[in-house]
Amino acid sequence: RIYGNRIVLFAPLYVGNECINDCVYCGFRISNKECQRATLSKDELIAETEALEDKGHKRLIMVYGEHPEYSPEFIAETVQTVYNVKHNKGEIRRVNINAAPMDIEGFRTVKSVGIGTYQIFQETYHEETYKKLHPRGPKSNFLWRLYGLDRAMQAGIDDLGIGALMGLYNWRFEVMGLLYHTIHLEERFGVGPHTISFPRIEPAIGTDFTENPPYKVSDED
């Protein structure tokens, strides 16, 4: 009724997996010695973008770990680099980003380069579980992450994506959390999220937690 009967695809482009958080379920966590760290150089970023354009992609989501190196200015610069790449008549017309929550000024910086959707997942809306699974790092602050989208709205970014990682807690509770998060944004800002995501935990290198998540979610669920 709103978007029509269509499916829109976007390709993921991981810019860097450096991270100072220690999320129990994540292969990128700082304590995971098996994770090989890398951040794309400008030339590498251009090459990746050209390869995606050659495959016909026009929409990307750029993904960043949470690390001082990935500042709002760095994110804005990498987004602009992608927009500038025109290869064999291809171009990226929309760059969405998945990055750590910022302050309002940080969000204004990334907005200035014309991002599409800003996406951030709460992971779990169950606060006690959240604290157990995020023992250290900036992401350990439940409320800072929860109200990240409020700050994005205040910065003028009204195209947002929310989500919960299924398997961390009871999926029915998480669905309720997603719905109430949507209601909160609609009531405060007059607009809800553009997208709602519900990925499931998948195995990650050096991460035993992912092999047997406490709240497995089936296809039927």
For each predicted feature, which ranges?
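Active-site beta-loop-alpha junctions enriched in small/polar residues
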Residues: 14, 65-67, 98-102, 123-125, ...
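Glycine-rich tight-turn/loop motif centered on a GG-T
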Residues: 31-39, 68-73, 130-142, 209-218
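Short helix-terminating capping/connector loops at secondary-structure junctions
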Residues: 2-5, 88-93, 189-192
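N-terminal pre-triad scaffold of radical SAM enzymes
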Residues: 2-32, 37-63, 116
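Active-site loop-helix segments enriched in His/Asp/Glu that coordinate
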Residues: 37-50, 67-83, 107-108
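Radical SAM/AdoMet-radical enzyme domain recognition
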Residues: 23, 59-60, 72-165
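Conserved C-terminal portion of the radical SAM core fold
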Residues: 117, 143-207, 219-221
